[in-house]
Amino acid sequence: RERCYITKENSNQFPQLVKFIEELRSAEVHKKIGSLIGRDLSNSFVRLEVICDREGFWLKPHCDIKEKLMSSIVFVNPHGESENLGTDFYDEKLNKVKTVPYKNNYGYFFTSGPNTWHGMEKKEIKKERRCIQINYVTFATDWQVKN
């Protein structure tokens, strides 16, 4: 499992992702997303993480911390991995109710809460399961939103 947060320190290695972060920071975008999820994002920070999971990876069902105002994943599937490798969502009794398909350039977003259980059961990963995780958070990152 490899993970890399995009920071000002490593931003020169990820110019396209920095452009994406700048869009997410813009008042127009964060206000629109805030209206969709019913949250005020005007004092938040963007956190973007590049994720590369390999064989053996799994993530137990959990709810995100309250400091994550919005969680989002965009799947990047250049190796034709199984669509079954998407995120699993669970009910309050931890019964799996939905797997979001792991398709290239496909994703989802949601807000944190007491019944937002998600994770990934252990599944066969042939090469890599890549995705980009985007969060609006209450704690400081290098990318405060603009107002």
Regions found by a protein language model. Give the residues of each.
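Short hydrophobic/aromatic beta-strand micro-patches
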Residues: 75
